[in-house]
Amino acid sequence: MNKKFACIGIVGHPRHPSALATHEMLFHWLVARGYSVMVERQIAQDLGLKDAVTGSLAEIGQKADLAVVVGGDGNMLGAARVLARYDIKVIGVNRGNLGFLTDLDPDNALQQLADVLEGEYIDEQRFLLETIVHKENQQCRISTAINEVVLHPGKVAHMIEFEVYIDDRFAFSQRSDGLIIATPTGSTAYSLSAGGPILTPSLEAIALVPMFPHTLSARPLVINGNSTIRLKFSQIGSDLEISCDSQIALPIQEGEEVLIRRSDFHLNLIHPKDYSYFNTLSTKLGWSKKLF
């Protein structure tokens, strides 16, 4: 039997009234069942929950056993980068569009969540990527990503010239619009749209996917998940950026390099007991249906 939960955190940034209604429904349902509940501070303000215990994402990560993220995959990614630093499990209620990472159907969320709270769930650990933009003898800039790290131009699209080193060995050079470095979790996101492979979540692997390469021979590359990737540039003629999950952007200046490696943190993502990754591929992404 899996671990049961005593303190539940409710997080997410609602963009429409139906999502906010789901937050409110969850709060009252959990309180009625006797659970200790922490609500992300902004949500409590939006709902007018004056007597609720509130906190930041970090405080919820420190004190709660389980975080319920209400929203779409963007909400999950933003919350997960913070919550991955703490010993807390995370599950999502889908109030977005695709909802690849948010398993619970809002129309049936309470029944599914009741089973999860009784210990009926599947536990997964999803690793993150750490990105470091640095130059010798200067302060570096660091961020993390659940899905992918993307090298791309800043404001105006243009060709980028760069070299890729894997574990300090030259791997390839490229002229392209950029490069996607994806985790297994992110292999079904931006990387997939660029022709990258699908990596099942338990794989210890990283995918490197070129973006519009100016060659007929460039192909996606899958490497060991413990490898260190270094991006070098002969010169940076105009704005370049590294983005993490399309939410955080780190500018790259002349003379700087980019280091990407597996983070020390991981996300404790849980699913309902009947969860199937391949069924999710089918229902969310139109993966091949069963023939017989």
UniProtKB/Swiss-Prot annotation:
Keywords annotated in UniProt: ATP-binding, Cytoplasm, Kinase, NAD, NADP, Nucleotide-binding, Transferase
Catalytic reactions of this protein: NAD(+) + ATP = ADP + NADP(+) + H(+)
UniProt record, GO biological process: NAD metabolic process; NADP biosynthetic process
Subcellular location: Cytoplasm
One MF annotation (Gene Ontology) recorded for this entry: metal ion binding
Catalytic residues (UniProt): 73
Enzyme class: transferase
Keyword match ATP-binding: yes
GO cellular component: cytoplasm
Entry annotated with the keyword Nucleotide-binding: yes
Cofactors, names only: a divalent metal cation
Protein residues bound to NAD(+): 73-74, 147-148, 158, 175, 177, 188-193, 247
Signal peptide extent: none
One family name in Pfam for this protein: NAD_kinase
InterPro entries registered for this protein in UniProt: ATP-NAD_kinase_N, ATP-NAD_kinase_PpnK-typ_C, NAD/diacylglycerol_kinase_sf, NADK
EC number: 2.7.1.23
PANTHER family per the UniProt record, alphabetical: NAD KINASE
NCBIfam families in the record: PRK01231.1, PRK03378.1
Its job: Involved in the regulation of the intracellular balance of NAD and NADP, and is a key enzyme in the biosynthesis of NADP. Catalyzes specifically the phosphorylation on 2'-hydroxyl of the adenosine moiety of NAD to yield NADP.
UniProt similarity note: Belongs to the NAD kinase family.
Protein known as: NAD kinase
Organism encoding this protein: Serratia proteamaculans (strain 568)
